[in-house]
Amino acid sequence: MPKVACSVALAFALSAVPGFCHSWPGGKASDRFDTGKGELEIVFLGHASLVFVYGGSYLYIDPVSQYGDFSKYPKADLILITHEHGDHLDPKAIAALSKSGTRMLLPEAARRVLGKGEALDHGTPLDVAGFKVLAVPAYNTTPGRTNYHPKDRHDNGYVITAGALRVYVAGDTELIPEMANVGPVDIAFLPMNQPYTMTPEQTAAAARLIKPKILYPYHFGSTDTAALLKLLADDKAIEVRIRNLQ
């Protein structure tokens, strides 16, 4: 398996961990961060699929087989699903990653579709596999788009805490009022894929509201990430990182 390069994070509270980087199947890239209680490695599988590695535990978010051969990946201690759409909920990937003791948290609507897992309501923090997980709302607001991710379906974004590091993975959402209560976070993954999620302008506005130290646009499809970089160019408090998360 090819080796991948580590990225250097901000020097203050979010400094990257120097040194050895893991190799991941398919040459998937990762960034590593000091949490104050060990390192967190975030692996970018593609689109909305991520892996968090912390304290010997493996957390998968929206694993989808298109973005990895999961027979070659470590088994999951925890799986988080944001909602029921096929580019986020993949029974084949879940089966490949599951072992005895794997826990899976997801919205009730997605749990009904899949037929298993634990429904996690918004605002209910849970400690699992060394992570603290908080589900938060994710939905569309623009007329004509609300059928994609309706508010009353109660899809999830997640705020994940590892050590002293807080990471917001927004799921499929537009800029919503509840984002004002998400921060402070160190890292944010915000979707940018009109008409399903946010425009670059909405993503920039969400970033200014949440104020992450590092922003990863994800789920961005064919959206021009240069537009987001330009919109946030004058905001020196937010570092925008572009990864292979189309």
Residue ranges and their predicted role:
Residues S65-R112, G183-F189:
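Active-site metal-binding motif and surrounding structural segment of the metallo-beta-lactamase
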Residues H22-P74, G117-G183, R243-Q246:
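Core dinuclear metal-dependent hydrolase active-site scaffold
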Residues E118-K132, D152, A204, R208-Q246:
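Binuclear metal-ion centers of metallo-dependent hydrolases, dominated by the metallo-beta-lactamase
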Residues M1-A5:
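Positively charged n-region of N-terminal signal peptides that target proteins for export
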Residues Y67-D69, H85-L89, R111-L114, T124-D127, ...:
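Active-site environment of divalent metal-dependent phosphoester hydrolases
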Residues S7-G19:
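Bacterial N-terminal signal peptides
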Residues V159-I210, P217-T223:
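Metallo-beta-lactamase
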Residues F52, H83, D90, V133, ...:
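Divalent metal-coordination and catalytic microenvironments
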